[in-house]
């Protein structure tokens, strides 16, 4: 029995007219997400990054050579507002991790590209990040992992379909 079970017991005692079963799912997801995010933040902080900065650098890195995307593509991949992205890019550019260049495709727009320093940093940090994720998921038996992924994928898809 965990803390969430004890909370559910209290609700069942106090409000037997309510089916509080979903509270267990949401309570555990919230507690787990909070703990996982705290653990992942340690990797970012150890490398003088925020999760937001990591997301931008990782998005550029996984795009493949020349590790450059338009600002609108970055916004689409990271799902943030334009102003939010501008602030992130300004901070990363000030650190020399990215640079804004004229878009070679049309000569008018711009692209955001990893610098050599940014590429070296994200290659190191993403390796640490993945190792950390392996460490964090080790508490879940390997045979349960595909089932969790399947359930979460289906649940997330139901929200994304409604959002259009």
Language model region names:
Residues 1-17, 143-164:
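C-terminal regulatory/oligomerization modules of transcriptional regulators
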Residues 1-47:
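N-terminal leader segment of winged-helix/HTH proteins
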Residues 18, 49-51, 114, 140:
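Alpha-helical hairpin
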Residues 20, 37-81, 164:
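N-terminal helix-turn-helix DNA-binding core of bacterial DNA-binding proteins
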